[in-house]
Amino acid sequence: MPLVAAACCALALAAPASSAVLPGFPEDARRHAAAPAERERFLVPLRGRWESGFGLRWGRLHSGVDISVVSNARVRAAASGTVIATGWLRNHWGYGLVVKIRHRPGLVTMYAHLSAAAVRRGERVERGERIATAGCTGSCTGTHLHFEVHTRGRAVDPWPYLRGKLR
């Protein structure tokens, strides 16, 4: 099974931005891809090792990317915005401690499995500002950041949004 996950990650990395959704996903998922102008504003939330990409994993959608890091790594806001949630999400306990930021109407990022949040709901944050500490809360197998991007309420592949390298 690890080979399948690695193949999914390689496919997601190699795919052009217009086809970042893995084959087999509903066509309407492609309609929610990011516009190039939106992608330019994002920073990689932290440096670490790419562990798992967006797409099918074990028969289910893995709706973000996982970045493995050392304990207590600082997590930065990918873009400026307003914190709309911190804490454990009802009905999504597997994410553990999360921070969600709205960057503009219809564009939200989520940072999960955190050990501590450095921001509060309603707080304005700037691109690159420290918002949390990476951890292993919820369902996880080691310290990492699970990072998601949502456009118009749907998870989309975060890879096209990220600037810089994850490794």
Where are these regions (language model features)?
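Surface-exposed, glycine-biased beta-strand/turn segments
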Residues: A17-L97, R127, V156-W159, K165
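Conserved, short, structured surface segments that act as functional micro-motifs
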Residues: Y95-H103, M110, E123-R167
